[in-house]
Amino acid sequence: MTAQRPTPEQIIRYEKDPKTKIATITFDRPEFLNAPTSMARLRYADVLRAANTDNDVKVVIIRGVGDNLGSGADLPEFMEGNDNPAARLAELRLEDDGVGEVSYPPKGTFRNGATISAWYANSQAGNRALQDFKKISIVEAKGYCYGWHFYQCADADLVISSDDALFGHPSFRYHGWGPRMWTWVQMMGLRKFQEMVF
């Protein structure tokens, strides 16, 4: 059973001011610590791609509603996708792409996990879209900056952080490393990075 979730447009709000040339992306799901659904991550990638092209945008500010930038992905939705190949194909933008019927690799196969993992490395998936953004990006970090939101901080040109901001990624606990760790280490040095993450 799939839970009711807000639309991508409700979770990822986008506004621009052509006069100042500043666009704002707001994560707006505070009751779930601004966790984006897979479709919201796709919208985020699309919005950044549009802002990258738009001559009326020179700077993008990224912020979260409530006390946190965000706690990472919508994990219940991700887990539902493990049993719903149609949801995975939709996330991969393959549900109706004009090439005919596509079957998602079955559970228990290497390709099942590798397919979604490879997709997450693609900027169109919304995980590293900010890394490919060619204009100025500023993230307002506060509260939890965890998982997917940690990526956004790592990929931004400038992070303005509150004193209570907590940076981290679940991979630190479960794998010993995390995507984008090298970005942070290069920017601030290993010791400062180790002090920063929780």
Language model feature labels by segment:
Residues 1-65, 79-86:
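Conserved CoA-thioester-binding segment of acyl-CoA-metabolizing enzymes
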Residues 6-7, 17, 118-122, 176:
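Short secondary-structure boundary/capping elements
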Residues 25, 62, 74, 152-154:
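Hydrophobic/aromatic residues within transmembrane alpha-helices
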Residues 32, 64-125, 145:
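Glycine- (often His-adjacent) and acidic-residue-rich active-site loop
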Residues 36-37, 73, 82, 171, ...:
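Short, flexible helix/strand-to-coil boundary loops that buttress conserved ligand/catalytic motifs
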Residues 47-50, 122-134:
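Catalytic-core regions built around general acid/base machinery
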Residues 128-198:
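Crotonase-fold acyl-CoA enzyme core
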